[in-house]
Amino acid sequence: KHMMRNLELERLTLAAMSLGIARRSIEIMNRYANERHAFGKPLRHFGQIQRHIAESYAEYMAGKAYVYSTAANLKLDSSGNRLDSDGVKLYAATMAKNVADRAIQVLGGYGYVGEYTVERLWRDAKLLEIGGGTNEAHHKNMTRELSSTLKLD
């Protein structure tokens, strides 16, 4: 019981770290898209760049809501929120990696080198997908939990 509560806290913490990675990636790609010009206009005027930034922001906000909701419902005196602690870590870590990946794409070659740090953010996000349980472990845990409770609030 004590160990499960610690796992729930760890997974929530990793999800919160994922939010930081995603937020920083969005800030970097947004700034770059405003500063960098191609064909006489800022990158932010191009549809694919807009898509990368908008999707990243929407996913970040969804992840933030999930992290805050899970944190608000966490009971520190007992375990019992395994479904959401697994789910929030699964979603947020994957989201952060995808957002960092988009940031690399927006920055092009600069995204791959250390000058803008998004390559490091991507590596950090990838590590968060593994730490605290792999995505596959979270899929298994969540499916087991859902099959026994079938609670969809």
Task: Label each region the model flagged.
Residues 5-153:
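Alpha-helical interface subdomain recognition
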